[in-house]
Amino acid sequence: MNYSFNFFTPTQLLFGSGRLEELKEVAPKYGSKCLLVSRPLEGSLKIIYQRVEKLLNSVNVEVVFFDEIIPNPTIEGIEKGVIAAVKNQVDFVLGVGGGSVMDSAKLIALLHHPGGEINWEKALISYNHPFNYVASKQYTLPFIAVSTTSGTGSQCTQAAVI
């Protein structure tokens, strides 16, 4: 059995009680407009979304909500997110939620293209193995994750499931 592989995770993880406030320092480094990717803006998480929006607005970062993420995300959902990012000319993507949100937000950031179209055949060939390093493409957007669950660890890896 071959136990040889590469694992690349350029992730900075800020963990601990009260650390959400640091979003005010981190986010502006990536621009002044973000696409906040989430589940529908309802229920108990709505308070978190409002808090994140208030934090970002306090440092002059505009928030564009994309709240169409469903469990087990679909290609169609990712396409809608990319279109929202392009239409609103965002500078970075912020995922707030659990694994499905993180996976969707990562793919929206990765597959972002000014024309809004996604070449799925090329994407699935280029990004088909989580242990291979593939350089970011020209239009990839920065990605920030605010995890609200402790399940999949999607906020820490380069892999995404759709």
PLM feature spans:
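ATP/NTP phosphate-donor binding region
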Residues: 1-92
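Glycine/threonine-rich beta-strand-loop-alpha-helix active-site module
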Residues: 76-162
